[in-house]
Amino acid sequence: MEITLFDPIDAHLHVREDALLKAVLRYSSEPFSAAVIMPNLSKPLIDTPTTLEYEEEILKNSSNFKPLMSLYFNDGLTLEELQRAQEKGIRFLKLYPKGMTTNAQNGTSDLLGEKTLEILENAQKLGFILCIHAEQAGFCLDKEFLCHSVLETFALSFPKLKIIIEHLSDWRSIALIEKHTNLYATLTLHHISMTLDDLLGGSLNPHCFCKPLIKTKKDQERLLSLALKAHPKISFGSDSAPHFVSKKHSASIPAGIFSAPILLPALCELFEKHNALENLQAFISDNAKKIYTLDNLPNKKARLSKKPFIVPTHTICLNEKIAILRGGETLSWNLQEIA
């Protein structure tokens, strides 16, 4: 059995920087046609020049791959700065509530403040797409749910602004995207295939720790059903986020799952298991093209076959290991060719 996926798109990707970028980028740039690149670096991408500099670093270390750049939402995003970004082809803003995830210490503290709303108004006028890490302070399993009032306010206040709920993780959020025409979402491999049991049901597995948390069986099943039917308001976004094993085994574990090396084989396995392979093309590419109005992307064909693939346990950077999701396991699908 074989399947060919055309122009795979990752609508949420972390490729880090410097040596780590060089070590992990190929896992995404080779099989994927394009990816929405996250701006929460150690020095956040808060303006056009730093974003373009980072884009150039990605382009120098890849080929036939389109990084779709995003700006880190901050008070310095004046109308003039947004216009400058737009002129350079930057179409995405990423809003991080302060302290909610990795490198979000510079995030937005007042989500409904006057400055935030002013920036969103300008973003709407210019046709930007708002991507949001939709969590609010509160009990860890309710953080996304607690952000619903903010999401509703955004959706109603800015009806022409496309708003993406990144890495949807709570089944209660599904009603929001079905209620509001301008609300969309991305889904990760880990949120549609894993639960809290994978993180802490046996021994604590730090390599399954991410934000937002993987949640209950009910959440996983409801989100998986969206993916399997390629819900038209949902696109695939891996949120692949590599960390060194030494950090993952420390007393203060950073959030992030490095899934990039297994994405296409694991998705094929999952969709085949549920008799939904015919919908994988829409989930992995077609929906994103429509939602984000993407065209002129590099042409890619990823051919996969139903042959065993033993997942490497890790990759190496600077003599340090980076653990790969499902490392050591055997997947039933294998990436055979990229053209």
Curated annotation (Swiss-Prot):
Q: What is its EC number?
A: 3.5.2.3
Identify the stretch annotated as signal peptide in this record.
none
The Swiss-Prot or TrEMBL record annotates one GO molecular function as: zinc ion binding
Lineage, top ranks: Bacteria, Pseudomonadati, Campylobacterota, Epsilonproteobacteria, Campylobacterales
Please name the InterPro entries in this protein's record.
Answer: DHOdimr, Dihydroorotase_CS, Metal_Hydrolase
Keyword terms = Hydrolase, Metal-binding, Pyrimidine biosynthesis, Zinc
Name what cofactor the protein needs.
Zn(2+)
GO terms, biological process: 'de novo' pyrimidine nucleobase biosynthetic process; 'de novo' UMP biosynthetic process
Q: Which residues bind Zn(2+) 1?
A: H12, H14, K94, D239
The name of this protein is Dihydroorotase
Q: Cofactor binding mode, per the note?
A: Binds 2 Zn(2+) ions per subunit.
Per the entry, what this protein does is: Catalyzes the reversible cyclization of carbamoyl aspartate to dihydroorotate.
**Reactions the enzyme catalyzes:** (S)-dihydroorotate + H2O = N-carbamoyl-L-aspartate + H(+)
Q: Where does Zn(2+) 2 bind?
A: K94, H133, H167
Q: What class of enzyme is it?
A: hydrolase
Pathway(s) where this gene product acts = Pyrimidine metabolism; UMP biosynthesis via de novo pathway; (S)-dihydroorotate from bicarbonate: step 3/3
UniProt binding sites for substrate: H14, V15, R16, N40, H133, H243, A255
The record's comment on protein family reads: Belongs to the metallo-dependent hydrolases superfamily. DHOase family. Class II DHOase subfamily.
Q: Which gene encodes it?
A: pyrC
Description of how the protein assembles with itself and partners: Homodimer.
- PANTHER family under this entry? DIHYDROOROTASE
Catalytic residue list: D239
| CC annotations in GO | cytosol
Q: Which residues are annotated as modified residue N6-carboxylysine in the UniProt record? A: K94
